[in-house]
């Protein structure tokens, strides 16, 4: 089961990369003005109720008014050698994903869910940063966590068995990708599921898919390019 979960995560990630979506892309928060204050419980609740209806204004406010949370979490990783502005930018990607995928019906606060997504986005970036691995001692204290405990580099980088973090990563990106896939018709979805093994099966070649569907490989190739272009547009609307 564990190997299956990791394999499925890899397949989803592979498709995300095919769509041109990279988790380590950096988006900067410009300006020097003070960040807006957090929302009150009632204000947040009103905005959350509008999310399922696709209210983009509510989405934007929820993101903006939770930027202080991004800064707070980013400062936990200041001693990793990464510029604080970069950490905030990366964490903001996690915040956007959190707001896009948050389910108001679940018994969890947005701040709690967003904190996990923000921290996970930063952790994923740090894992891919070879400069940290080579220049900082693996057991060197980096900072103090929220509970007052020393935060070691080994805690930040984790291991391949860090299933909790992998699950958050998979759930956030897969949820966004599933929303994009829902915009496809049945044949288009079938092609993507077969090509990228999205339903637990092995990945199929274009020739395999063509044979299974009774059409030419060149036609499958053209369809796949068109579908990926469409998926990229749908995904970019949500991220």
UniProtKB/Swiss-Prot annotation:
Domain of life: Bacteria
UniProt entry keywords in alphabetical sequence: DNA-binding, Sigma factor, Sporulation, Transcription, Transcription regulation
PROSITE patterns: SIGMA70_1, SIGMA70_2
Propeptide regions on this chain: 1-29
DNA-binding region per UniProt: 206-225
SUPFAM superfamilies, per the entry: Sigma2 domain of RNA polymerase sigma factors, Sigma3 and sigma4 domains of RNA polymerase sigma factors
Listed CDD domains: Sigma70_r4 (cd06171)
UniProt feature coiled coil, ranges: none
One biological process term in Gene Ontology: DNA-templated transcription initiation
NCBIfam families in the record: PRK05803.1, PRK08301.1, sigma70-ECF, spore_sigmaE
Family indicated by similarity: Belongs to the sigma-70 factor family.
Function in brief: Sigma factors are initiation factors that promote the attachment of RNA polymerase to specific initiation sites and are then released. This sigma factor is responsible for the expression of sporulation specific genes.
Protein name from the UniProt record: RNA polymerase sigma-E factor
UniProt organism field: Bacillus subtilis (strain 168)
Organism ancestry: Bacteria, Bacillati, Bacillota, Bacilli, Bacillales
